[in-house]
Amino acid sequence: MIKIKKGLNLPIAGRPEQVIYDGPVITEVALLGEEYAGMRPSMKVKEGDAVKKGQVLFEDKKNPGVVFTAPVSGKIAAIHRGEKRVLQSVVIAVEGNDEIEFERYAPEALANLSGEEVRRNLIQSGLWTALRTRPFSKIPAVDAEPFAIFVNAMDTNPLAADPVVVIKEAAEDFRRGLLVLSRLTERKIHVCKAAGADVPSENAANIETHEFGGPHPAGLSGTHIHFIEPVGANKTVWTINYQDVIAIGRLFATGRLNTERVIALGGSQVNKPRLLRTVLGAKVSQITAGELVDADNRVISGSVLNGAITQGAHDYLGRYHNQISVIEEGRSKELFGWVAPQPDKYSITRTTLGHFLKNKLFKFTTAVNGGDRAMVPIGTYERVMPLDILPTLLLRDLIVGDTDSAQALGCLELDEEDLALCSFVCPGKYEYGPLLRKVLETIEKEG
């Protein structure tokens, strides 16, 4: 087992009950274009078109052959675009049960599949988009080969679902999915799970299981990659989430695209935090209807540390998100708040009484408790960064855009989620995720 000591389990109220309930009926789903870094769509449908589940909606011009398929059947209700016609979302009004069928295989045939058969079925069904590269966190090219594939079967994000609960319901599909992935490449398939977690595996020669323990970010793929198979400019690995492995197993067994998602609905503003069964890309406001405390709330697709605000054209569950988090908007200001002991506020430093209340769960808000200021290196980044890098120096380079130094300090190993805790504890109130993305884009473009 690999146990990390540095990190932080956020003591946030509203942790979900780890029991799966059926979610509400969803009448609108969407694919969010801005989730796919660098993607430029070539649209295959227009508003008003009827689509079947599994039908191609658009293809990536910059990554030919990578197609994005409809998670449900229905009609194209809207295609939202932002500045410079950047695709924001393709919205589908759910109607009927028409679907496209893909290749299916008998259980005993899965162990003998060729890599080309696996690749073709994943690409045609749209499940190829479940894979992401590291570095750069992009969908891999259809003819690319990884050094390894990392299956993330654990989640240490605040308010997250326990993967063991989800996998237990679909253990056979998860095993089949692992077997299919083992046929995609001869390289290692690293299955990463929590210490002692009951996660099934397969007896394929290239599948290895690893256990991780410790606080968040022990459950992030970036942490797993760093300790098992570090990447660089000339070494790329792929990552995939456990629920997508289940979907792959079901696709190859039945020939049908599985777009079901089990998500955690949690946070201090949720009346009954719990796990819900819904669909990929579901309209978030329909999921949360009647579920929230009547207040000024911020609804987030994903983790409170690194999720996306859901509103307008973005009011949909993200492709790579397994949770919806709800906290209160922190619009009020306190007069001389820094003087009070503040037992109801949490800080990683010893500046509030809440820091010393070890078993207390706090009602976090969106308030950052201060304005923008200079980066202050007081050791907070080192306390939450378990990777073998120099976080203060790296974060400084991200702020000033020094790509050469940032690359030398290990930025290619990282994704936005890997720096979310650094943003949370930053005295200067910097958001390091967008700064990292900007540097990665520059490195990819200019080398």
UniProtKB/Swiss-Prot annotation:
GO MF assignments: oxidoreductase activity, acting on NAD(P)H, quinone or similar compound as acceptor
EC number: 7.2.1.1
Pfam families per UniProt: NQRA_2nd, NQRA_N, NQRA_SLBB
UniProt entry keywords in alphabetical sequence: Ion transport, NAD, Sodium, Sodium transport, Translocase, Transport, Ubiquinone
GO biological process: sodium ion transport
Catalytic activity field: a ubiquinone + n Na(+)(in) + NADH + H(+) = a ubiquinol + n Na(+)(out) + NAD(+)
Quaternary structure and interacting proteins, as annotated: Composed of six subunits; NqrA, NqrB, NqrC, NqrD, NqrE and NqrF.
Its job: NQR complex catalyzes the reduction of ubiquinone-1 to ubiquinol by two successive reactions, coupled with the transport of Na(+) ions from the cytoplasm to the periplasm. NqrA to NqrE are probably involved in the second step, the conversion of ubisemiquinone to ubiquinol.
This protein's name: Na(+)-translocating NADH-quinone reductase subunit A
Organism: Neisseria meningitidis serogroup A / serotype 4A (strain DSM 15465 / Z2491)
Gene: nqrA
